[in-house]
């Protein structure tokens, strides 16, 4: 199989993998409301945290990151070039954002994008996760943390392994574009802060 054919095959596979909505499936499995119609309406880990608690959100985060990491890392093992790896990672994110299996109504693609970046190295994964966590703790805005971390990601990559700076910049651009409405709400002071759903106390 030619390099072009292999790349196209992996792009399709990545999109289909990304189209599996972890948030919707985890909520169904746990008897929670559909995240597309509750909370912020975004089927992602942050909204699942709001409506279902930390354990459900952690499951969604793990599987959303896995959707980005697996196809990208497999493509890397196949010897696919860096720019094509970026396209494959973007395909996984587009699957998450516009999932063919769930009516093309998906999430922001942040966890999937960070998952696609993670195989570059443990040091990059730690930098990304630490940046996001610290920014959320300081600001209480998941969207702001995602935007700033996306802006930092190409700089981290250039510093740690500059071969993948362009693919990471491609993913960062997608994340920022996807957050355009959040940016408008942040500027207006209307963005929702992160808060975990409080369960009723048992008498």
Swiss-Prot record:
The compartments listed are: Cell inner membrane
Q: Which reaction equation describes what this protein catalyses? A: an acyl phosphate + sn-glycerol 3-phosphate = a 1-acyl-sn-glycero-3-phosphate + phosphate
Q: What EC number is given for this enzyme?
A: 2.3.1.275
One Pfam family matching this protein:
G3P_acyltransf
Per the UniProt record, which residue ranges are transmembrane? 6-26, 82-102, 118-138, 141-161
- The answer to whether keyword Endoplasmic reticulum applies is no
The entry's keywords = Cell inner membrane, Cell membrane, Lipid biosynthesis, Lipid metabolism, Membrane, Phospholipid biosynthesis, Phospholipid metabolism, Transferase, Transmembrane, Transmembrane helix
Q: Which domain of life is it from?
A: Bacteria
* Membrane topology designation: Multi-pass membrane protein
Extract one GO cellular component term from the record. Answer: plasma membrane
GO biological process entries: phospholipid biosynthetic process
Q: Which InterPro entries does the record cross-reference, listed alphabetically?
A: G3P_acylTferase_PlsY (IPR003811)
Q: In which pathway does it act?
A: Lipid metabolism; phospholipid metabolism
For this chain, one GO molecular function annotation is: acyl-phosphate glycerol-3-phosphate acyltransferase activity
Family the entry assigns: Belongs to the PlsY family.
HAMAP family linked to this entry = PlsY
Summary of subunit composition and partner proteins = Probably interacts with PlsX.
Write out the function statement from the record: Catalyzes the transfer of an acyl group from acyl-phosphate (acyl-PO(4)) to glycerol-3-phosphate (G3P) to form lysophosphatidic acid (LPA). This enzyme utilizes acyl-phosphate as fatty acyl donor, but not acyl-CoA or acyl-ACP.
Q: What's the protein here called?
A: Glycerol-3-phosphate acyltransferase
